Amino acid sequence: NKSGTVTAVKNGKAVITATVKEHPELSASCNITVMQGANALKKSVSQVMAETSAYMRAKDTNPSVGSEWFVLGLARGGLSLKERYFSTYYNHTANYIEENKGSLTNTTKYTEYSKRILVLTADGKDARNVGGDNLFKYISDRSLVKEQGLNGPIWALLALNCHPEYSFPKNSSAKGQNSEDALVNVLMQSELSGGGWALIGNNHDSDIKGMTLQGLATYSHQA
């Protein structure tokens, strides 16, 4: 019609071309596929959220190490932190850390600590005192965190910024003392030409770029 709205009359494929009236030399075309519209949502968002929460808890009845994304999703989704689900996860995690003398990984995946910090904080707990253990001490050596590639610094920065009182404890044996500024510099210095980041090599990677921007989002006002 005259307002520029295009209405399909049947299913199928078509080509739509738009032209600027005053400048007919300016035009663009796109291919579209017309399909039957999806059914309208019959349930409210809150009802769907409640059903999803119930399903997750039914699938994960005894949350422990390995339940992190369930715990984070339920906590951020609004499930009361007073629910036994969260205390069960915390107790299992604290016991696991104590039994394994603080070890959450036997590789360079120090994101395991950052992930627990994020989840436990969402759970309403203080990651600096998990059964008496400060999880930040395990990611206080920047050189170790960097061994995992960009994911290490990204997740360490996310963990650090998930609570205003968090900080890295002094680590006298560290090859490089970790700090907020140091992590930001690592990410900024890893930026590729054209404004992107890569997990490996020099090819822009949309996934790692998205994660890097999440880590740097706190500092967007400084750009």
For the regions a language model picked out, list residue spans one by one:
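Extracytoplasmic soluble-region selector
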Residues: N1-A40
